[in-house]
Structure formats: structure tokens, C-alpha cells
Amino acid sequence: MANYTGANVIVAGDVTKYQPDAFGFGIASGDTETTNFFAQTTNDIFRQLRVEWWPVYKTNIFTDITVLNTAEMVNTKVNLDQFERAGVYLFLGRFFLPALTKFRPETQKDRFERMAEYYMGQYNIEWRMILEDGVEYDTDADGTIVSNEREPLHGFRRLTR
């Protein structure tokens, strides 16, 4: 079942699949801070999609030139299920682990700083892979993704004659 509900891209259970002890360091899965981090993770993924992927998508899909500058991405049409792994990496690397670190000098980084760096690196790799594979965007809002609703970053369909 695809996630088009507008809910967060990940929940605590998704995080523990990748980092089983994540919520054992002082910030619990149900804390307000964690809830805010989930929302920030989702918002950052949508923002990055709007910046990197949406301009390519709308140029390739919309043939009416008058629509190009006015078409906005509809968040509830993006299948968030494909961003689970990227969402976990972003949550851990940008929000959760930095909240736990003491930010020591470069030579004395603590466990959380090192983990945050690792997860941000993994996020960048996963993000690129998703964009290259194709973002699932339910253009007609029918709840299913067909082949022409999966657009890679480079818009390979432009070369089709």
C-alpha cells in the first residue's frame, strides 16, 4: 500500500529496523522532540524534491507552456514509501544523532558525531539512487503508479520520439 496520506515519511519502527538501539540513548521514540524530527525529515525530503526533481518532472510532463511556471508539486501525490530508507538516514544523520552529540573537536568526535556523518553519507547515496531510479508521483491521483508516473531525475522520456 503506497503512502499518499500526507503522513510522515517514517515512524519510530522504521528507525529501529536500521538502528535497533536508537531510542535507548536518552531521547525516546514517543518524545515531542522525536515527533518534531519526524516532521522535519518529511519536510526536508519534500523540499529537496521540489528543488532537485520537480523542475525536471514538470518540464517533461506538462506540455502546455503556460502551466510550467505555475505548476506546484502536490505532496500527497508523492509515494513516500520509496523514501523510507532515505528518511531514516536523514532522520538519524541530520536531526536525531546531532541532538545526542557533544560536538567535540575533530580529533575527539564522539560516537554520535561519527554515526551522524555515516548516516548523512548514506542518505546522499540513497537520495541519488531514488532520483536516478525514478520518483513515483501519482499524477492522476488514482492511488496507483503506472510506468509513466515514475520519473527519473534526468527525464529519459524527453529523448523518445
Name these PLM-found stretches.
Residues 81-95:
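Elongated alpha-helical scaffolds
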Residues 4-6, 27-31, 93-161:
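Short loop/turn elements at secondary-structure junctions
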